[in-house]
Amino acid sequence: MTSKIFGSIVALVLACSSATATDIRRVVTALDGNDKAIALFDGRVTLEPGATPSAKLWVTEAAPAPLSFTDDSGAKPTALPPDLGTALLVVEFPPLDPAEEAKMDPNFMMKIIGERAPRRGLPVRHPLMHRTRTVDYAVVLSGEIDMMLDDSVVHVRAGDVIVQQATNHAWINRGTQPCRILFALIDSPQP
């Protein structure tokens, strides 16, 4: 059966049951006029009051997703979404040992991502720097971490939300505890 969806909206909605949590930090990345990754928005989003306080953090205009009620889509062997697809994953970033960091291949992440990585915005600033052809919704579940962009570093911690719009970035944990992040990756056209 074929289903047509017109004007569909995909919204990331964060619901919070705690009456004391009134806002959430949201960081949205974008490309500037020189193709550099920047933090376009970095501020607080206030939860709408109600029985289940919530805040709409980002909206895109389309995402027809096929439904599968039998296959385990989480068993697929890739972290990146397929063409026109999505991927949901949790990543735990251990603290980065400075000695190991110094020995890293400058194109470490680009080699891992391979052909799916856009070629604009190179060379990379750090071995962990990468860029995928996706919009990524990220929620820091625990710990804290630095998000390196082309010309800045944004420090995020548990409870912060990031929207990556196919920009160069690296996740660098310079702390002493692991940082766990939930990612929803959505395939997008080449920026």
Residue spans of the language-model regions?
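Double-stranded beta-helix
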Residues: 27-32, 36-41, 112-119, 174-191
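Boundary at the C-terminal end of the N-terminal hydrophobic targeting segment
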Residues: 19-21
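Bacterial N-terminal signal peptides
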Residues: 7-17
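A short beta-strand-loop-beta hairpin characteristic of the jelly-roll/cupin
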Residues: 124-126, 130-132, 137-158
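Ligand-binding loop in jelly-roll beta-barrel domains
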Residues: 86, 144-146, 153-157, 166-190
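Conserved short histidine dyad/triad with adjacent acidic residue
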Residues: 44-45, 89-132, 165-168, 187-189
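N-terminal secretory signal peptides
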Residues: 24-64
